[in-house]
C-alpha cells in the first residue's frame, strides 16, 4: 500500500460522488427532510425533543452514512470498477483505505448538516461544545463508512442494501439505550449492547449535549468507536 495510490483512489471517489446528484441529495436533502419531520412531530413537546435529539443525531448519522457508503461502493463493484482496479498495481489496502478516505469528507459534511439543522433550525437546547459533538460523530462515521463497505459485499443491487437496514440498524436502535435505558434491560441484552457501535455514539452525545461534558469525558466512547472502525477496515 502506498500513499500516492491510496490518495488517487480516494480522489476518484470524491469526484464521482460530487458528480452524482443522488448522492448529494442523500448527503444533504434526506437528513434535512427527516429532521424537519421530527421537528414538526415534536413542535409542541420541546422538552422531549431536547432529550431525544442526541440519540436522533447519532442514529441518523449512522443510518445515512451507512446507506451512502453501501450504495456507492456497490455501484463500484457492480460496474466492474473494482475488478479493473485489482488488475492494476493498486493493492487491496490502497482500495479499502482509499474508499474510506473518499467517503469520509461527505459523511462529515452530512453530520455537520444534521447537527447544524438540529441546533439552528429546530433550536434544541444543548450544553456542550459543538466541536466535541463533531469529533465524536467523526468516530461514529468511521464505523458507518466501513460497515457500509462491508455490507455492500453481500448485496447484488441497491434494493438489497436497503434490505440490510433492519438487520444492521434495528438491533442497535433497540440496544443502544434510545428506547429503554441500558441499565433497565435484562442482563443478556446489556451484554449484547456492548458490541453495538450506536450505543457509544448515543452515550457520548448525551454526555456532551445534555450534561455539558467535554471530549476528555467521552474519550472512552471515541476510542471504542475507533476500535470498531479499525476492526471493520481490517
Where are these regions (language model features)?
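Small-residue-enriched core segments of transmembrane alpha-helices in multipass membrane transport
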Residues: 53-62, 134-144, 166-174
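Transmembrane-helix boundary motif in ABC transporter permease subunits
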Residues: 144-157
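Hydrophobic alpha-helical transmembrane segments in multi-pass integral membrane proteins
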Residues: 176-181, 205-211
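Transmembrane helix segments
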Residues: 37-45, 155-195, 199
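Transmembrane helix-boundary elements of multi-pass transport/secretion proteins
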Residues: 2-83, 92-112, 117-133, 154, ...
Amino acid at each position: 500500500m502506498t500513499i500516492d495510490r491510496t490518495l488517487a483512489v480516494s480522489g476518484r471517489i470524491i469526484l464521482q460522488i460530487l458528480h452524482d446528484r443522488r448522492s448529494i441529495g442523500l448527503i444533504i436533502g434526506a437528513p434535512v427532510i427527516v429532521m424537519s419531520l421530527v421537528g414538526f412531530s415534536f413542535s409542541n413537546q420541546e422538552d422531549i425533543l431536547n432529550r431525544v435529539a442526541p440519540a436522533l443525531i447519532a442514529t441518523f448519522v449512522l443510518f445515512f452514512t451507512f446507506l451512502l457508503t453501501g450504495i456507492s461502493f456497490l455501484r463500484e463493484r457492480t460496474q466492474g470498477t473494482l475488478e479493473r482496479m485489482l488488475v492494476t498495481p493498486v493493492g487491496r489496502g490502497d482500495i479499502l483505505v482509499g474508499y474510506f478516505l473518499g467517503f469520509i469528507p461527505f459523511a462529515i459534511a452530512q453530520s455537520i448538516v444534521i447537527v447544524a439543522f438540529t441546533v439552528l433550525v429546530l433550536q434544541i437546547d444543548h450544553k456542550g461544545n459543538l466541536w466535541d459533538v463533531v469529533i465524536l460523530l467523526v468516530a461514529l462515521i468511521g464505523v458507518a463508512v466501513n460497515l457500509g463497505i462491508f455490507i455492500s459485499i453481500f448485496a447484488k443491487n441497491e434494493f438489497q442494501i436497503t434490505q440490510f437496514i433492519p438487520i444492521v440498524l434495528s438491533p442497535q436502535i433497540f440496544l443502544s439505550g434510545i428506547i429503554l435505558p441500558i441499565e433497565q434491560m435484562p442482563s443478556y441484552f446489556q451484554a449484547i449492547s456492548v458490541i453495538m457501535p450506536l450505543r457509544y455514539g448515543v452515550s457520548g452525545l448525551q454526555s456532551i449535549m445534555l450534561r455539558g461534558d467535554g471530549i476528555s469525558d467521552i474519550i472512552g466512547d471515541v476510542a471504542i468507536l475507533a476500535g470498531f472502525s479499525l476492526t471493520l477496515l481490517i
